[in-house]
């Protein structure tokens, strides 16, 4: 596509591949715009979760262990992970291309290699926990840009988030790992008492304070978009 595409937005390893092959230069990385923003999601249907409760918990356990493994000991396992997913039956990209962003560096153009420690974070900072407040933020954006056609009251946002995000399943998986001695209790917040609503926070992207308890007020704070 060289010469036919002016720009694109894509995740790794495709930006680093563009640099290595000499047909692209990244302008900015998403973490500069949105620090610790969500990127990938694991989702299943309600019917699958209800019909396969044990399988569902086991899959979440595997995801928790894998994400913890990727972050532990100052990213000590990231090169091994890059070697695994570089295989043709997974991503099929050169190992050194994948290694860059996984190990905390990013090459903006050939020779311009900069540290980017938090570019990929999987477990540290409780990023894998399904917080209702995160779901509510996404829902406000869907309303703001018209994917949700009509105005919704505050309670709708939380009720909808609770249908999609399942911290109860995450908690079962975490407690099981702790009981098995595969994870430590200290690696998690107090899931038994958690509300799964984060405190109000200001986004680096737009500078507007987001309070998950007041989604309609958050929407009203923007000059552009649906309310």
Task: Give residue ranges: language-model regions.
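Ligand-binding "clamshell"
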Residues: 17-31
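A conserved hydrophobic position in a structured secondary element of the catalytic/binding core
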Residues: 10, 44, 51
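Solvent-exposed loop/turn segments at secondary-structure junctions
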Residues: 13-16, 32-35, 48-49, 65-66
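Secondary-structure end/capping motifs
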Residues: 51-166
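Conserved C-terminal helix/tail region of periplasmic/extracytoplasmic solute-binding proteins
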Residues: 136-227
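Short helices/loops that flank or line small-molecule/ion binding pockets
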Residues: 1-12, 17, 21
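Small-molecule pocket liners
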Residues: 24, 38-47
């Amino acid at each position: 596509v060289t010469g036919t595409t002016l720009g694109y937005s894509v995740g790794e390893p495709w930006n680093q591949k563009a640099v290595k092959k000499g047909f692209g230069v990244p302008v900015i990385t998403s973490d500069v715009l949105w620090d610790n923003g969500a990127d990938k999601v694991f989702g299943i249907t309600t019917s699958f979760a209800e019909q396969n409760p044990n399988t569902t918990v086991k899959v979440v356990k595997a995801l928790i262990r894998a994400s913890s493994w990727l972050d532990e000991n100052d990213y000590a396992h990231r090169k091994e992970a890059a070697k695994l997913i570089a295989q043709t039956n997974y991503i099929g990209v050169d190992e050194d291309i994948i290694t860059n962003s996984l190990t905390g560096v990013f090459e903006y153009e050939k020779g311009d290699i900069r540290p980017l420690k938090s570019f990929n974070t999987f477990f540290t900072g409780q990023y894998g926990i399904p917080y209702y407040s995160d779901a509510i933020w996404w829902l406000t954006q869907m309303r703001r840009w018209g994917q949700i056609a009509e105005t919704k009251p505050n309670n709708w946002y939380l009720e909808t988030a609770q249908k999609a995000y399942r911290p109860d399943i995450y908690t079962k998986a975490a407690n099981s790992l702790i009981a098995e001695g595969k994870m430590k209790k200290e690696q998690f917040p107090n899931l038994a008492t958690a509300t799964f609503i984060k405190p109000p926070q200001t986004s680096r992207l737009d500078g507007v304070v987001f309070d998950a308890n007041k989604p309609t007020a958050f929407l009203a704070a923007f000059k552009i978009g649906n309310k």
